[in-house]
Amino acid sequence: MSLDISQYPVLAQANTPDELRQLPQAVLPQLADELRGFLLKSVGKSSGHFASGLGTVELTVALHYVYNTPFDRLIWDVGHQAYPHKILTGRRDAMHTIRQKGGIHPFPWREESEYDTFSVGHSGTSISAALAMAVAAEKEQAGRKVVSVIGDGAMTGGMVFEAMNHAGDLHNDMLVVLNDNEMSISENVGALNNHLAQLMSGRFYTTIRESSKKVLKGMPVIKEMAKRTEEHLKGMVVPGTMFEELGFNYIGPIDGHDVDALVETMRNMRNLSGPQILHIMTKKGRGYEPAEKDPIGWHAVPKFDPSTFEKPASKPSNPTFSQVFGKWLCDVAEKDKKVLGITPAMREGSGMVEFSQRFPKQYFDAAIAEQHAVTLGAGFACEGLKPVVAIYSTFLQRGYDQLIHDVALQKLPVLFAIDRGGIVGADGPTHQGAFDLSFMRTVPNMVIMAPSDENECRQMLYTGYCYNDGPTAVRYPRGSATGAPQIEEMTALPIGKGLIKRQGQKVAILNFGTLLASVLTAGESLDATVADMRFVKPLDVELIKELANSHDVLVTVEENAIMGGAGSGVLELLQQLKQPMPVLQLGLPDEFIKHGDSGEIIAELKLDAAGILEQIESYLA
């Protein structure tokens, strides 16, 4: 149910940017307050990304007030912070459906709104896209402006600097807003800097600056002296030298919660030529005390009552697979100081908080730099250390070349703990772990494991830790484990060997991963044999031969794309054995899986027990 908009009188007049731009500037602070209040209650009712959006309220208001969106292009990096943008661009009354099946998308999405000029979800893409749009705008000669908004966390990714380096060379008109909400670049915030930013972006300063460049053209010594003098004067109060060296004109830092200062500065910058960067300082979770104190904990929230100032206590459940991994990592690190944990800025999500605290010298946060994280692991392995790279399936895509070139090619023993394999649910198509089994299967020297429960997960992680002949991967899903009684003793599994879990007849179901419980339920109804294959690569050749010889039909089940996945490996093996037979492959279809509750999606894809049974019976009919 949408909120009563009558409680937000100014926001009620700004359902679209066109309406927003009709408001007098004097009411923008009130609009920002109402927008923040609406966001607070809306996410409380729907769940979703929370703290980031609270920090970008004033920025969002200013951007849509100054720029003629959607004609002017506005690109958000990642998109966690774009909830206020969605509210102001005609989706206010649908915010209660965000991240839900059939509801609005969790991130900016081109198919959803003309105001979402570039679909996002992963970090570091906005400046590349903005540069391309700026080049296109210049060719079009229609006066279109281009703005990208990127957080300081995303600035750790190499793609960002690749794009900035190119933008500085091409020198097209574009604005990059650096939303610095971690104080990681500068703490020089206050009235002086706000005033300086407006001064530096004003016509007088920019005219003098550009005129000086023209006058000094062809006089390299004097030009260099003038440049250094300018940088020295600016550098006393602003940290812009790095951006200037990349070819950007740097403005800031300014208070990102002063909507009037943002509007005036952006108005000044709107018609500046060349690439510009506006550095703003914001507070993640702004306006809600618990989120301000713990922005990481309040990054994303379930449904909650904002008036309690507490997130609802989670119901007692089984540990998550991430927690199972984190405990295992601590257990082995206690006994082996060569064990190193690496994460690309996903410490909390990957279950590595305790490890980072107990073993700080063995913990490495590579920041949002997946390529670097993978090759960092390769380098450690070269020196006889035991690197464990904890990474989400969707983010390993970004380190694929490094997986091949830097790890597998050299047969380096790097263990990949791949979290969020399969359906992740509410974050949608940018985050579903649909492809990892497919893209890893093709890589020589890889060993790939898919546990059916938390005990197998621990044993497989230990197997990867013990394996020294090349890289290993253990792939597990998001969310709670199965509740299997924990076996503390860790034993390395025989490589490439599966288990028969149920003996049946005619139909043999080969399970890869945590859908085993549903497969066993379907197997009971069919009186089918069920095998827990454990290894996606290498496959258990002898077991598959045995099952093929003793059954009429094989069925493969995996929470991965059918194309190129584990089932494809079974088909390839049967062809090599010259033993063709009916094989039904069940898994994710050849499409990007939309957002929604994980259970709902699994059921819709017919990968729950009832759906698996239905698909097999239909195939046999």
Curated annotation (Swiss-Prot):
Cofactors, names only: Mg(2+); thiamine diphosphate
InterPro entries in alphabetical order: Dxylulose-5-P_synthase (IPR005477), THDP-binding (IPR029061), Transketo_C/PFOR_II (IPR009014), Transketolase-like_Pyr-bd (IPR005475), Transketolase_BS (IPR020826), Transketolase_C (IPR033248), Transketolase_CS (IPR049557)
Enzyme Commission numbers on file: 2.2.1.7
CC cofactor note: Binds 1 Mg(2+) ion per subunit. Binds 1 thiamine pyrophosphate per subunit.
Residues binding Mg(2+), per UniProt: D152, N181
Pfam families for the chain: DXP_synthase_N, Transket_pyr, Transketolase_C
Biological process terms in GO annotation: 1-deoxy-D-xylulose 5-phosphate biosynthetic process; isopentenyl diphosphate biosynthetic process, methylerythritol 4-phosphate pathway; terpenoid biosynthetic process; thiamine biosynthetic process
Reaction(s) the record says it catalyses: D-glyceraldehyde 3-phosphate + pyruvate + H(+) = 1-deoxy-D-xylulose 5-phosphate + CO2
SUPFAM superfamilies per record: Thiamin diphosphate-binding fold (THDP-binding), TK C-terminal domain-like
GO cellular component terms, semicolon-separated: cytosol
Highest taxon listed in the record's lineage: Bacteria
Pathway of action: Metabolic intermediate biosynthesis; 1-deoxy-D-xylulose 5-phosphate biosynthesis; 1-deoxy-D-xylulose 5-phosphate from D-glyceraldehyde 3-phosphate and pyruvate: step 1/1
Record bears the keyword Magnesium: yes
Keyword field: Isoprene biosynthesis, Magnesium, Metal-binding, Thiamine biosynthesis, Thiamine pyrophosphate, Transferase
PANTHER family given in the database record: 1-D-DEOXYXYLULOSE 5-PHOSPHATE SYNTHASE-RELATED, 1-DEOXY-D-XYLULOSE-5-PHOSPHATE SYNTHASE, CHLOROPLASTIC
Recorded family membership: Belongs to the transketolase family. DXPS subfamily.
Subunit details: Homodimer.
Protein name: 1-deoxy-D-xylulose-5-phosphate synthase
